[in-house]
Regions:
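A detector of single, family-specific signature residues
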Residues: 1-159
């Protein structure tokens, strides 16, 4: 049973234990998860706007920036095929997209603030190709990397 297995595991001399995350680490990881959810919602909203406009023959390239740039001109263009109801819908969806985009930016602001105050996270960022988002997520998930003695044990923890 489970209790027996736990007792056996504790008694083994070569058993390694994963350190418990601090409240701060859990909070940073929660902000990362929230950011990821907002990014997913933003992408879904952008794709919905693109898809609805495509049904009226209006094509917007991929990228949030393209939508932000093109939406005002599309809504003001009285010669396109958009009925009034559709214009209002697209306007509201565009406003919702702006709100979700602001939520993503706020999560990124919080992550960057934490990153700025975290020496291990800043050290990771010094490695080429690693930015504040990746560095802070890694430091928050791993914590003290010294608890992993050989590099192979760290690798097996993170796939």
């Amino acid at each position: 049973n489970d209790a027996e297995a736990i007792c056996e595991a504790v008694a083994r001399p070569n058993m390694r234990f994963v350190p418990v995350k601090t409240g701060e680490q859990q909070a940073v990881l929660s902000v990362h998860r929230a950011r990821q959810g907002f990014v997913k919602a933003r992408t879904a909203q952008a794709n919905q706007i693109r898809g609805l406009l495509a049904e009226f023959g209006i094509v917007i390239p991929k990228g949030i920036g393209h939508i932000a740039k093109r939406l005002p001109e599309i809504l003001e263009d009285g010669e396109n095929a958009l009925p009034g109801m559709m214009r209002q819908l697209v306007r509201e969806l565009g406003e919702h997209l702006k709100v979700v985009d602001q939520q993503v930016k706020e999560m990124e602001r919080q992550i960057k603030l934490w990153h700025r105050d975290s020496e291990p996270s800043r050290k990771l960022e010094a490695i080429g190709g690693i930015g504040p988002i990746t560095a802070s997520a890694y430091v928050a998930s791993v914590g003290d990397a010294k608890s992993f003695k050989p590099s192979l044990s760290r690798h097996s923890t993170h796939g």
